[in-house]
């Protein structure tokens, strides 16, 4: 039996980009969350422990590790603070990939997810970098989402929709914002 770290990164990419319809990427489905937890829970734990370092030798392997940390965390731990716990790890991997120009070896569809940790960050400096990355990518819809994320961080310095889950007290302005359409992703 292979260990989680021996699982080939291609299985992650095949699942995310071939098995799943793109409409499932940004939705919320208990069935998908359960599937990801069942199929990839062990690999997720290996990623959290830093055991997938061998994947980083190839741009696609690094992307797979980012998807596991950034996207699968949100599925496996939906409605839990743990959904965001690996964001820092995923961001560092994405920053290293971009510094090494590894993103140039990925398809546009793959680059969307390589850049996603930037969009998920609560740092305005990182959000500014996110805008540059998504603008250069040239996919208008993704750029609009990056801009919406940026604008929330520019206004509040954090994502108000995470406050309750993370035990943070919301300001009056944040509470009013949370009543607006499009205040959560």
Q: What does each model-found stretch correspond to?
A:
Residues 1-63, 68-79, 83-185:
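Intrinsically disordered, low-complexity activation-like regions
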């Amino acid at each position: 039996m292979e260990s989680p770290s021996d699982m080939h990164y291609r299985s992650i990419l095949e699942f995310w980009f071939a098995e799943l319809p793109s409409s499932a990427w940004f939705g919320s489905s208990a069935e998908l969350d359960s599937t990801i937890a069942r199929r990839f829970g062990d690999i997720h734990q290996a990623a959290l422990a830093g055991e997938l370092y061998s994947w980083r030798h190839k741009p696609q392997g690094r992307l797979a590790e980012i998807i596991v940390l950034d996207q699968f965390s949100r599925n496996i731990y939906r409605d839990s603070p743990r959904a965001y716990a690996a964001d820092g790890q995923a961001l560092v991997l994405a920053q290293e990939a971009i510094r090494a120009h590894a993103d140039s070896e990925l398809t546009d569809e793959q680059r969307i997810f390589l850049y996603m940790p930037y969009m998920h960050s609560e740092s305005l400096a990182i959000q500014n970098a996110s805008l540059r990355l998504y603008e250069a990518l040239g996919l208008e819809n993704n750029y609009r989402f990056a801009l919406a994320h940026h604008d929330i961080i520019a206004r509040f310095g954090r994502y108000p929709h995470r406050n309750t889950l993370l035990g943070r007290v919301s300001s009056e302005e944040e509470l009013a914002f949370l009543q607006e359409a499009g205040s959560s992703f």
